[in-house]
Amino acid sequence: MSRKASEDVEYTLRSLSSLMGERRRRQPEPGAPGGERSLLAAESAASLQGAELERAARRQFQRDETPAFVYAAAAFSALGGFLFGYDTGVVSGAMLLLRRQMRLGAMWQELLVSGAVGAAAVAALAGGALNGALGRRSAILLASALCTVGSAVLAAAANKETLLAGRLVVGLGIGIASMTVPVYIAEVSPPNLRGRLVTINTLFITGGQFFASVVDGAFSYLQKDGWRYMLGLAAIPAVIQFLGFLFLPESPRWLIQKGQTQKARRILSQMRGNQTIDEEYDSIRNSIEEEEKEASAAGPIICRMLSYPPTRRALAVGCGLQMFQQLSGINTIMYYSATILQMSGVEDDRLAIWLASITAFTNFIFTLVGVWLVEKVGRRKLTFGSLAGTTVALTILALGFLLSAQVSPRVTFRPTAPSGQNATCTEYSYCNECMLDPDCGFCYKINSSAVIDSSCVPVNKASTNEAAWGRCENETKFKAEDVHWAYSFCPTPYSWTALVGLVLYLVFFAPGMGPMPWTVNSEIYPLWARSTGNACSAGINWIFNVLVSLTFLHTAEYLTYYGAFFLYAGFAAVGLLFVYGCLPETKGKKLEEIESLFDHRLCTCGTADSDEGRYIEYIRVKGSNYHLSDNDASDVE
């Protein structure tokens, strides 16, 4: 700390001391009625407030002293988030080219999309034991190596089996990174920057998704090898992360846990610059000693977490947040944004891909807003507001599809199916009914913006660009005759509603429900349970990710498009109640202080918010709790 900053700190502390001394002089004499009780309350309150103000003053002057080293560690760590976003987002555009070149059926398309997600879920569940044994740094090095190898395999793949192998390897890498990166960032960050730096990981995830959408659009014009560039480019950030982590240290908390105290102290000092580390070091060491005593009981860590009420509640909150993040439809929006836009009436594939990049850009920009808000608003309020807006946006999106369905063109021409050909499609009466059947397409003409001579006929299994028979059988011929063919969308004047709904959804989702489940999970577990807790919550995230992404098209088929989005809106509304009742505020608290937030019953812990103007404080003195009541606090005044 500079000499000027040190002088400012000392001046501030002297002023605080003088202020607290003046406050004590105004208290009643011990012999006065209620004097002893009031004096004790006043001294307790003064001590609490003085200590808090002192810490606040030191944080204020130390804030600018945080070494650039900490920011570099957070940035290289967050490249794992970039890979997460890129590899999960790029496949939607690549699939448009792959399915034609390799003649992929529906099953193989689903395998390639969900293979990486499923592998990531397995890796995340096993990742707790992995980074607990190897360390956070080694786990991230392994993740970046897997992503590099997997991306190279994908770029060079000659068949669909090799593609699947590459996707599985990439999935293992991003699964390990998804639950290790937030923990590493949280453990190397100072308390006043922890929430913001952890949120940077989600910023990089959304940045990766946006970059993937731009890459998809740029290489969509290369029909033959464009997908190789799309899938192979992920190797570049993976190599950068691997090289960067060769020069970054291990988490000091993990080192202390493993008994490497001198190395941990040296790294902690390096990460805090000129700030004193004695208090933080002692706090970490004491918490580890207490947690080792608690963890000395036999049995798996997950069993001990479930048998100990505070960690059981923390695990329920952490896993619940990850579950509702997925059930509110985020990866339906991100994986299928181009498909959703096409469903709404956007005819051209390339236009749908470029419009999808708008949603990815919105996600990226408003994640930046979340980075700014997280330490100002707090985790609880930001998450609650985000889910409330998400619920409204999903409802608007559903209403847009409902409006389009109500004006869906009628089938006015029913051609006779050739002998031996499927005639099921000709039985549908409206375009939206026709589109819900993946084997059917809509053939029509336009007269003065009105749809005429429309029919529902089977799609050509070799190419979805034309029908199996009838007027739209030959793409070159029917286009010359001014006949139009629609597959997976209906002509409608309300196609713009989907883009508006998607953008509005991400405006609300990105600042809160995007980063907060990861931020909260990096904070709420004691050290002995942190790896396992984050592994379980990340695994839940990936499991529901697989569930939602694999069922969206079938859900839309059985419930209609608007029914699917009404369903997601219902899930988001239930998540809103969950956050209101169960999520406590962790803003500004040390990792060692957060465990006590879950001493309350689950249905009330979310309401125990000290920032709401209450005067209740708990003072830990030699293992005892002294409670300063509202009445005592009023006596202080």
Swiss-Prot record:
Extracellular face residues: 87-114, 159-167, 223-228, 335-352, 404-497, 560-562
Function text: H(+)-myo-inositol cotransporter. Can also transport related stereoisomers.
Entries under SUPFAM superfamilies matching the protein: MFS general substrate transporter (SSF103473)
Gene3D superfamilies: MFS general substrate transporter like domains (1.20.1250.20)
Native source organism of the sequence: Rattus norvegicus
InterPro entries: MFS_dom, MFS_sugar_transport-like, MFS_trans_sf, Myo-inositol_Transporter, Sugar/inositol_transpt, Sugar_transporter_CS
Chain positions carrying an annotated carbohydrate: 422, 447, 474
Annotated localization: Cell membrane
A single cellular component GO annotation: cell projection
Bilayer topology term: Multi-pass membrane protein
Protein name: Proton myo-inositol cotransporter
Reactions that this protein is recorded to catalyse: myo-inositol(out) + H(+)(out) = myo-inositol(in) + H(+)(in)
Residues found modified as Phosphoserine: 6, 44, 47, 629, 634
Keywords: Cell membrane, Glycoprotein, Membrane, Phosphoprotein, Transmembrane, Transmembrane helix, Transport
Stretches for region Disordered: 16-38
